């Protein structure tokens, strides 16, 4: 099966879940499953890479079991019959805790990373290119399932016509004096694990639809403290998206996500737990504009819990979703979108994942 580019993630899918892997698996393909193990029900969960939705042909069955001290079963099912189990007598997951589970498809095997560390490799028993479906079931809650094919090289259109995606890099923290918004507290420094992935094509079950644009880029899993700063090559343009995931610290007061244009902050998103608000604003020439605070429902972030933020750029505004739910729109105050080319994240969170 020919792979037609990367596909957009499934956001906050209900479990049990089955979804299409567009174009099927290819050598070098990477799938990330982000979520949390439920603390009060069930003793198992499973991630299956299979052909079709019947479950009779599963190329790779990854099955953590919180029994007998905890272990993980790997297996293959062909025509309804299971093969011999491979067991890893170690449990990298904890009940009630978030996880980042990454599957890397290689010519000979699947390599499985849990929270940034290599956990197991599973040698193919059937041709992996037959796989066109991913399923998740059991005692987990999902934040997202994302996809990346680092070998896909779609053509980059002009700004006026391009739908989205952009690679990311890690420049040094910029110098200079910038007026900070009142009472934005610094982050508690903590090492983190991050994966940077491109996901750029529409699929059913997502909030926003997308099509390929710029070649995806993949980075290793460095550990570094907050704040996190990176360039956005090409800047913003209609249909470009940015996705960030992390965990709010238990004692969090505030954190912020900034999209910057030179010394200006085109978009400042500032969840404030001390005010039970999500403040949005723009800073031009070191001067803050009028705040926007309205929300359609309660505060979407919770202390001590994981989150996923999706920022979608459109011609007139930014659309923002939290955990798969649309929460607000922010109309552009700086309209030269391609100059908005830097992302800054800081405050009382642990950042775990960035997709651009």
From Swiss-Prot:
Alphabetical list of SUPFAM superfamilies matching this protein: Concanavalin A-like lectins/glucanases
Keyword Cytoplasm carried by entry: no
Highest taxon listed in the record's lineage: Eukaryota
GO cellular component terms, semicolon-separated: cytosol; nucleus
One Gene Ontology molecular-function label: galactoside binding
SMART domains from the UniProt entry: Gal-bind_lectin (SM00908), GLECT (SM00276)
Entries under Pfam families matching the protein: Gal-bind_lectin (PF00337)
UniProt keyword list: Lectin, Repeat
GO terms of biological process kind: negative regulation of CD4-positive, alpha-beta T cell proliferation; negative regulation of type II interferon production; positive regulation of gene expression
Residues that hold a beta-D-galactoside 1 according to the record: 82-88
Residue span, Galectin domain: 17-148, 228-356
Region annotation (Disordered) ranges: 170-190
Repeat as UniProt keyword: yes
Sites where the protein binds a beta-D-galactoside 2: 288-294
PANTHER family listed in its UniProt record: GALECTIN (PTHR11346), GALECTIN-9C (PTHR11346:SF80)
The protein's role, per its UniProt record: Binds galactosides.
Further information: The LGALS9-like proteins are encoded by a duplicated regions on chromosome 17; there are at least 3 genes coding for galectin-9-like proteins.
Name of the protein described by the UniProt record: Galectin-9C
This protein's encoding gene: LGALS9C
